[in-house]
A protein has these predicted regions:
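Low-complexity or membrane-interfacial segments used for flexible interactions
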Residues: 1-65, 72-75, 90, 101-217
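Hydrophobic, ordered structural segments
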Residues: 77-79, 84-94
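Short edge-strand/loop segments of extracellular domains
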Residues: 96-100
């Protein structure tokens, strides 16, 4: 991976599919649509109105731990599986092609570790990288007080800048904006953003023993 810190990579970075790499910078708005007993979901739109995705976890309080990413036509392009969720501790996610969680369809994984209370880190791993050897391919670094986060390659190359709008970190932000650099797989970035959002503000698993505490937007 490149060590450059410029905002646009020289070569397209395709993780999910090359069709999601475009020559122009894209601004996305990701908002929490629903959070109740039957559905935990997000909407994803861009400034041009050409992209209108839904990311849905069905029956979040009844054992489902998978977000499914639906494109404009409703096709499932990716499944995001959560495991080992622990509040203010360590959790992990894995992304797969389509409606699958099979090893042959594995795309990437992330782990979250809480260091300081006001900072959250996600380390990401591609199939060719072994986490146990101490390497990682990309990371998400976020600061609660600034309401922002950055996705970087290991060498420091910035792939995306994002910031939260509507609400606050600790109280539960309802939406955020993501600016994806040109030639960067935006499906990959959207998946990372939802993983980050879910792990940071508290997912459905946080409330599994306290359903009366859930507040829907």
């Amino acid at each position: 991976m490149s060590d450059s810190t410029s905002s646009s990579p020289l070569n397209p970075i395709s993780i999910v599919d090359s069709e999601y790499c475009v020559p122009d910078e894209i601004r996305f708005h990701i908002g929490r649509k629903c959070f109740d007993l039957d559905e935990y979901s997000f909407t994803v739109t861009d400034d041009s109105g050409k992209i209108n995705w839904e990311i849905i976890m069905y029956n979040p309080l009844r054992g489902d731990n998978k977000f499914r990413v639906h494109d404009n036509e409703g096709k499932i392009i990716m499944t995001l599986q959560e495991s080992n969720f622990e509040v203010f501790s360590r959790s992990s996610y894995a992304a797969y092609k389509g409606d699958s969680t099979e090893e042959k369809d594995f795309l990437f994984s992330v782990t979250r570790t809480w260091g300081l209370f006001w900072k959250c880190d996600l380390k990401g791993y591609l199939p060719s990288t072994k986490e146990e050897k101490g390497g990682f391919d990309f990371e998400v670094v976020a600061f609660w007080l600034n309401k922002d986060f950055v996705v970087k390659q290991k060498g420091g190359h910035v792939l995306v800048d994002g910031y939260f709008v509507g609400g606050n970190w600790i109280g539960g932000s309802s939406s955020f904006n993501v600016i994806v650099s040109s030639n960067v797989d935006y499906a990959f970035i959207v998946a990372l953003a939802v993983m980050f959002f879910d792990s940071s503000i508290g997912s459905a698993r946080v409330w599994k023993d306290h359903p009366d505490d859930i507040v829907s937007d």
